[in-house]
Amino acid sequence: MPVHDASSLAAALSRTSFMDVFQRLDHAVLESLWSEGDARSALEAMVGNPAASPDTRFLAAEILFAKVPGYPPPDAVENLAAIYADALRNAPKAMANPWGMPGMQDGQIAQHVLLLGEAAIPALRAQLDDARSVTFSGSKEATFGNSYHYRIKDIAAELIARIRNLPFIPDIDPAGRDGAIRKLAMTLK
């Protein structure tokens, strides 16, 4: 999949997925997307373009995190916070593994949100009422993660607590987590 300019890179991103680029053992897709032309500038432009599709912006950001040491620059953090909040809103459409399991492990995407720091909190705050379920795949991780019935708001709460260095220990019961999430939300007002 050689890519020669910004428009063909955008088209290539629209035809692929996070799983294709980051979760296959063969990283040929990532390398192909990165190797042709001025991929960095094109990807940065996509991240900053509100007219680009949310999925394209998110995938462009993930590639930049993977390929550019020290990414993101300070002037991109607020924009990235909105992109990642949108990705979390869309998490039920995909497997949740890259977000990690609250209280247990950070996934690749969660690590990137944590790097955004305080700028991510307003966008994540809006997710604390989203009770849609997320699904984990695999064997051990899926069995454990899905038994907890994690939701978008659980992941958002975990990320906010980590950014603010606040306690958040996910209860096995969603109703118990709801109480902890309400307490966390009160600290954000």
Map each language-model feature to its residues.
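Extended repeat-based scaffolds of very large eukaryotic assembly and lipid-transport proteins
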Residues: 1-189
